[in-house]
């Protein structure tokens, strides 16, 4: 007897604001939901005691899941082997008689396995590879907002190289780790600006270069989406260059000041 996961919705993780400067504000990136961490499946063939089999009442073919709620039911249109869903077909989940998740694709021993499409009640969907009941392999998650995440998935989570595209066309290409943008990556803005560098838990952190559409640029250290540490801002309309230590997006040198990822008010300059 093997285990298949029930409905597993993606949740909003955080907002990822863009850096800002004194000469020209940068638009907010908006929310970038990243799939939440999913529970680990038991080893196939060794289900926990609190597992239940959910059967199609018309065919008797079923799947097995952990801690199934009493009001869950399914409808399976494909083949059945040893009373478990097998091969290509459509698996429709119901909760209290109301349709919820819908899976169209390949099954093996009652588990999502191979190519498939999983559609959620909020109209979000995942299309790609599954393994042992999890999103595993190459796939694309499409959010209700129209945002898209295309990546390598491992045990249900984006892991490795991938691309996230916001509804407004801004896009991130780079590393994902532990369900977050972590590692090296690039954000490309629709206005022609870009950031290339390091990320930690979805934020610009480490060394990186931010270039604005008007030619201004900051190159140096970042923390929490702000210039923090040693860095240089240059290329503004007035031609000034600011080199030195930055703190929480703020820089002051005698009578001059500048911001990257902060506002003049938050830095106490106004």
PLM features: what roles do these ranges have?
Residues 5-6, 17-270:
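Intrinsically disordered, low-complexity repeat tracts enriched in Gly/Pro/Ser/Thr and acidic residues
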